[in-house]
Each structure stands twice: as C-alpha cells, then as structure tokens.
Amino acid sequence: MSQWTPEFNELYTLKVAMKSGTPDAPTTQESLKAVLLHPQPLGATKSFPAEVEMINSKVGNEFSHLCDDSQKQEKDMTGNQQEQEKSGVVRKKRKSQQAGPSYVQNCVKENQEILGRRQQLETPSDEDNDSSLSECLSSPSSSLHFGGSDTVTSDEDKEVSVRHTQPVLSAKSRSHSARSHKWPRTEADPVPSLLMKRPCFHGSALRRVTCRKRLVKSSSSQRTQKQKERMLVQRKKREALAQRKYALLSSSSSSSENDLSSDSSSSSSTDGEEDLCASASENPSNPAAPSGSIDEDVVVIEASFTPQVTANEEINVTSTDSEVEIVTVGESYRSRSTLGHSRSHWSQGSSSHTGRPQESRNRSRISTVIQPLRQNAAEVVDLTVDEDEPTIVPTTSARMDSQTTSASINNSNPSTSEQASDTTSTVASSQPSTVSETEATLTSNSATGSSVGDDVRRTASSAVPESGPPAMPRLPSCCPQHSPCGGTSQSHHALAHPHSSCFQQHGHHFQHHHHHHHTPHPAVPVSPSFSDPACPVERPQVQAPCGANSSSGSSYHDQQALPVDLSNSALRTHGSGGFHGASAFDPCCPVTSSRAAVFGHQAAAAPTQPLSIDGYGSSMVAQPQPQPPPQPSLSSCRHYMPPPYASLTRPLHHQASACHHSHGNAPPQTQPPPQVDYVIPHPVHAFHSQISSHAASHPVAPPPPTHLGSTAAPIPQHLPPAHQPISHHIPAPAPSAQRLHPHEVMQRMEVQRRRMMQHPTRAHERPPPHPHRMHPNYGHGHHIHVPQTMSSHPRQAPERTAWELGIEAGVTAATYTPGALHPHLAHYHAPPRLHHLQLGALPLMVPDMAGYPHIRYISSGLDGASFRGPFRGNFEELIHLEERLGNVNRGASQGTIERCTYPHKYKKVTTDWFSQRKLHCKQDGEEGTEEDTEEKCTICLSILEEGEDVRRLPCMHLFHQVCVDQWLITNKKCPICRVDIEAQLPSES
C-alpha cells in the first residue's frame, strides 16, 4: 500500500470515470478493447468529492506498495493522476464488482485477454501486480462499469487506480468491455491500461470497474450531506446507466458477474499476501471474472488481506446492480456503515439492471455485499435479487468470507465488515428484513468486526486455511466439472482458465438470468437470513476443501468456473472468489447460500439453482446460511439443492440453465437439483453436504438448513455426481444430476415429495403396493415387502424370499434409489402409486389372498414372478388367470366321472359294508347305529333318501350325483378325503 502512487490514483480516476461514464462507453467488446488499449483518464471527466479524496489519501499510504507496478500504467491515465493520488489509499478496499448481466459475457473475454496481459505485467512485480490486480478487480471495474458514482468517484477512482495499476489493462479491459456491453460509456475508460497493468485481472478488474465502487468514508450509516448528494447523483447516473445496461443486461450481467467472481477468487488466493497482494491474488482468480466479468450488479468486496488494509482500514465495496460501492473502513470498519449506506444507494441505482432500478438496487445492495464473496455470475444475479431477495446477501457474505479467508481472518473481518456495511446499506435501501439479518450479522462485524469477524473467522478459519492452502485443487475439481459448464457458457474465454472463464461466465450468465428473474422474487430475501455470517461460514468451508485452488490465478479460474460450480465457489478458498462462485451462480448454491438447489431449494441447486437456485436456492440457502456451521458444510453445496433442487419454480428454470453451467443449478441442486421441493433434501435441491460432497444444490428448498449442514451430505448421496462434486466443482456432476431439465427437476421433486408423502408406502415399490398396502405395516416399511401384506401368513417367508426380495432388490433398490430417481422413474413412480390404489383393491376385494399366497402365486410357482406381473395389471386379469390355471388339472370331464365312479340308486341297507364300516368307526355305538340307518351327503348335508341317485367315489364315499358331479367338474378329488377319483378305482366297482 505504501507504494501507492499518483499513477494509481489516475487509474482509479479512470476506473471511476468508467463507472460514471458508462453510458457512452462502447457497447462492444471491440470498443472495450480499444478503450483498454487506449484508456482515457477518467479523472478529467470526473471530479471527486473531498471526502472521497480524503479516503483515498488514507488508503493510499497502505496500498502504495501495491500501486508501484500499476503506477507505470497509471501514468497513462495522467489526467486522473491527481485524483488517483487522492484515492490511492482507497485501494485498501477490494472493490467488489456488481453483477452486470451484460458485462459478464463481455468481460469474460476481456478478462481472459487481460489475464494474459496481467501475467506479462505481473512478471516485473508479482506482489504489486497481485495487489494492484485485486485493486483493479475490486475498484476499477466497479467504478468504471457502474458509471457515475459521484460520492465514490474520487475514492473509487483512486481505489480503482490502486487496484488497476497492475491489472490496469485487465481492469480497464474488463471494465470497459463490461461497461460497453452493459452500459455505453462516454468516457474512454483507463481500464485498458489498468488491464494491461494486470493481465490476470483483466476480465475481473474490468467487471469490477463495471461494478461501480463507492468509496465511503468511515461513517457507514452517517454520511455527510455531501456524500448523500453524491450518492444521489451517482444513483441517478447508475440508474440511467443501468437502464441502458439492462437493455444489454443479458450479456453484460454475465460478464460483470464473472469479474466479481474473479476478484473474489484472486483475493482468496493470495490470502497470505498483503492486502493488495491478496488483491492481486484475487485478480489471478479474476481471470475467471473476465470470463464471467461481474456486472455492476455484482459487488466485489475486495478485502485487502495484508495488514496494510486492516479490518478497520479495509475498503468496503458495496455494489448494487449498477455499481459497486467501495467504502474505506478507515477504522473498525467505519466505512462499512458508509458502505452500507452507499450500497443502499447503489442497490437502488442498479435496480435498473434487473429492470427495477430502485427495488433491484436495494436488493442488489444486499446482494452486493454478498457478491464480493461469491463473485460469480449467480452472485451478480443474486445481487440484484438480494435487494429483494436477501439470498444474495449471504452469498456476498460468503464470498466476502471467501475473500477474507483468502487474505486472512483480519482481512475476512474487513471483508465481512464491508459486507456488513453493504448489507446494512441495503437494508436501509431495500430489504430491511433481509438486510437486517445480513446487516445484523454484518453490522456486528462492522461495529467490532467480531461478529462478522466471527462469521468471517468461521468462514475465514475455514477460508483462511483455505486461503492458506490455495493448493486446494478447486480448480482441478471445478475445472473438469466446469468444462461441462464451460461448454454451456457461450462467452467464457480460455484466456484465463478456459474452465474458469467459461464457468465464470456461465455462472455470471445464469446469475444474470436468474438475477433478472430473481430480482422480482422475494424468495431471495431469505438469503439475508443466512446473511454474511452464515454464508461466509458455509462458503469458507467449501473453500477450505477448495483450498487447492491455489493462487490468485488458480483461484481466479476456479472462481470463473464457479458460476458453474457452486461447490467451486465455496471451494474458492480464496475469499471473494470462492464464495461468490459457488453461491452466486449455482443452483447448488446451497453450497454458498443454499442456492438451488436448491438445488439448488436448490440445486441445485440449483445451479438451478443458478440464479434460480440463487433465488430459490438463495432463499433456501438463506435459511441455512444463518446456520454458519451447516452453511460452511454446504458452502460448496449450494443447492444446489438443487439443484435440481435448488429451486423448483424459478429455481427450476434457472437451475436448468444455471445447473447446466455451474453445476447444473443448480438445481437440485440439485440438488440436489435437483429439484427443489424435495429436490432431495437428501440430494442436493439438491443442496450439499459440504457441498463438496455435493452441494445441497439441489439444495432442497425445505431441507437447506439441514441440507446445508447435514443434508448436504445426503444430497451428495442422491446427487453425488452433481452435487457432491460441488466441492470439487459441483457444477459438472451437479449439472448432470442437477442439471436436469426443469421438467426432470420437477419430476424428481415430485418423486421426492411423493416419497415423503407416502414415505412408508414407498411409492417406488410399485409391484407390491397392493399387497403391502393391505398389510398393517403398509407404508411404514422402507422396503416394500409384498409378503408383508401376508406377513402374518406362515407361507409368506419363503415367498418373500423369492418374490419380495426380488422386488425389494430390483424395484426398491433400482426404483427407490437414494433419491436420485430418473425422470422416467418419477413417471414410473406416479403410476405405481396409482397401482397401489388399483392393486390395493385386490387385497381388499380378496382379503384372504394375503392368507393364501398360493392363490396369488398359482401360476408363478409361488415365486411371485407371475404374481408381480398380474398384480401390476388389474384385478380382473388376475381373476382370469386364476380361472385358467384353476381349471387346468383340477376338474374331471363327465366321461371321467362316469368311468371312475359308481352311480346308482341309493338303497338303505344296514348291512351295507359301507354302513358297517362307519358304524365301527363310531365310538358311540348308539349314535352310530342311529346314523347307520341315515347316511348324509357331505356336500349338501342332506340325509340320503331311498332311491335317490347317488354316486360312490373310488374312496367309497357316497354323495348325491348332482352334488358330487358339480364338485368333480371343478375338482376331481373326493371332497372328504381328497383322493383323486382317477388315482385308484375301487376293486368292487
């Protein structure tokens, strides 16, 4: 920080100019490139308030060392040097980019290019470049992209300069591209030079430039009148820009978002480095941002991890849909309050991003706070949604935590402080309740830094270790999985990390999609529930697993991938990146914020939830997020429920799209999705055991809380491929599981709900439904034991072995697998339920069938094979089968009866040998004697009369011909002794 120079201030000014001048900026990447290559000093175009300058002065000293490298680039922006000198100190804060739908896509490419440039530039001063890169990521892009932030202009420009000095090219490029796509900028952004300064940062910095940064002084809530006025002016500018930008929302949002993501990532990467260094580290992650540059909507709170930016000095970057606010927390997160207020402003201003400038902004405000942590496309969307949907806040918090984690606990606290401030402002601005939660959480940090610090520590402890072990191969985990998503993202460029780029863009893209969708959805507000603390905790954990995401570069890539990978976002051990990636985009966001999956609620996921996950998942995650512990475990899980489970409604839709990119989102899941309703509380909604095993991404909306913490694991079970990988990169597996078509997600959710509803019934066990339905325990056993229906019957045991075991193994195991029911299974299950009802009739109609399994299994050899088939059919079929089988070897033809029996006229003869035999058999002689004279037909129980036609069977039993003939037609055995009439012919006959 000590190396910060006027040149950096120039950069900052340029960045701010980009922010405020967004309207006229080129709307094409070419224009952005041109601007990047030939940045115009923004300082000349803008004048910054004295307060901002003061803040810049404060921050400049600390960040000057980071600015050394960027100074060279800053010199290109001589017009802004003076202002940048003032705002040089601002670098301390990591600017958080706000998600801008349009910027994400454009910035991804820009970021990739910038990444290359930054790598080249970083060669001279790696540490400075990293720091500057972070600065660029945090400050320039947001400032430049958001266009017009009077209050923050000076500070932002300074901060931007600081951050962009090294990644000047990156920041400018990203900022410019994002800006041009999102909102035309009149000013030639100095982003190109900034980007050139920091190639790695390129996309992310640019995005951050896109995300307007607001540098607020110490007071968070208490802003001077001047600041308020500036804020109002900025808000107006942002709204105008946002409206323009939102026209281009779909593309710019993605880019912007990615920027945010990358910034966050790089920050967490460098964790060990100084604030600026950490920032630079984040910048490397930022390359992911370039692929999915964060929009103005995305707030990248770039927490300086070095002592230079202490918790109190850390600059809080608050962003709304349109811009990012950077608040310098000069002391004890003083800025946080300001930032919060700023954020409210920005949220309102950037509302237009979602089409509701004010409402979105407010939501964005909260989301902005979260955005920095998430820093992924979903983040951006979440930001906008967060205004209305607190979900974003947790994401930001998580992202911030990730950043913080990357930098250090202290840094985390500052980040959290920033988030808290942002959240607070958001609360004031929009989502009081949502923000309240976030604000309360963040405010505590803001006041003492301990509350957020704790959360951050939770996250940071998770995250710091994560940042400590940047080696965590989140990138590898994410990348492979991102690659599926990567394909999805149209504009992810391989410049940075192909996967990270794509995923970032994907995530951002979806985030923007979701953002647009979610902004209107209050569901997101739930996110604030799990606000920063929970989110940070959640994310960081995932990040820790993702610690492998080693340095800024890796983190950057992962972050970019994160949009695809909810888990990744969490995996992004490096603070902002990790969090934002997973939470923001994926439906699996459950990882980050239980987004979808939810699955995802949401999964998610997911991925769904993506934004949908964000919306649904966010809301879902939001609930769990308040539970820091569960959240951390779910941090990588986002939802993902699914999510396939991330969010069924909107989440489903988004999960489908988001899930595809990030984990499917989502979506899930999630899902874990997949989706969301029951997106598998166990799967994702697909949410996210640690989402690493699988996010809840399909975060199941309902299960997110447990899902995040404990359900997360279950979700991995069900959506293991999609959501479990979340830690590695839930996106890929989650996409497969959570990335189910919304229809599939719905089916899965329906199946799960059905399961839950008929839990004991086990709808999936169709074959025996009717049998066990009759059984008293029907619906109580997880396994369907058709024999259970006849469990009381002795015969049931063997049959159960053959038939029931087969059913249980085949049907129960196959059909009722963990919860990962295939869409077709879902269809199958529904019919089985019907079968339950239909077949249930059979046991009811023939109650004794349970007692006589042989009746059921007559044709199946009592093995149940045939029985299962018939029972699946209708009862009538069974009856017919029974008749056919019954008549097969049982009745005797009339000819056989005549041939084998002795028909004659009954004659009472007491001496009849037959009567004599009966007499001797009787113990009671008297009765016997009495009966000897009166024989009865045992079929009709009538006394045989003299002269009646009777038939004597080979066994010598006598019956009325009419009675016995009817019997023999159906059964050729003696009704009394069961001897076959053909078995032995009487010798006398």
Curated annotation (Swiss-Prot):
Pathway annotation: Protein modification; protein ubiquitination
Zn finger spans (RING-type): 937-978
Residue spans of biased composition, Low complexity class: 131-144, 248-270, 278-291, 345-355
Glycyl lysine isopeptide (Lys-Gly) (interchain with G-Cter in SUMO2), cross-linked positions: 19, 33, 46, 58, 72, 86, 95, 109, 172, 197, 217, 918, 922
InterPro entries registered for this protein in UniProt: RNF111_N, Znf_RING, Znf_RING/FYVE/PHD, ZNRF3_Arkadia_E3_ligases
Record note on disruption phenotype: Mice rarely develop beyond 15 somites, have a reduced head, fail to undergo turning and die at midgestation.
Motif (SUMO interaction motif 3 (SIM)): 380-384
Regulation of catalytic or functional activity: Binds free ubiquitin non-covalently via its RING-type zinc finger. Ubiquitin-binding leads to enhance the E3 ubiquitin-protein ligase activity by stabilizing the ubiquitin-conjugating enzyme E2 (donor ubiquitin) in the 'closed' conformation and activating ubiquitin transfer.
Biological process according to GO: DNA repair; pattern specification process; positive regulation of protein ubiquitination; positive regulation of transforming growth factor beta receptor signaling pathway; protein polyubiquitination; ubiquitin-dependent protein catabolic process
Region (Ubiquitin binding) location: 902-904, 952-956
Binding site for Zn(2+): 937, 940, 960, 963
Chain location of the short sequence motif SUMO interaction motif 2 (SIM) per the record: 323-329
Record's compositionally biased regions (Polar residues): 97-109, 393-451, 548-558
EC numbers on record: 2.3.2.27
SUMO interaction motif 1 (SIM) (motif): residue ranges: 298-302
Assembly, per entry: Monomer. Interacts with SMAD6, SMAD7, AXIN1, AXIN2 and SKIL isoform SNON. Interacts with (phosphorylated) SMAD2 and SMAD3. Part of a complex containing RNF111, AXIN1 and SMAD7. Interacts (via SIM domains) with SUMO1 and SUMO2.
Role: E3 ubiquitin-protein ligase required for mesoderm patterning during embryonic development. Acts as an enhancer of the transcriptional responses of the SMAD2/SMAD3 effectors, which are activated downstream of BMP. Acts by mediating ubiquitination and degradation of SMAD inhibitors such as SMAD7, inducing their proteasomal degradation and thereby enhancing the transcriptional activity of TGF-beta and BMP.
Listed name of the protein: E3 ubiquitin-protein ligase Arkadia
Recorded name of the encoding gene: Rnf111
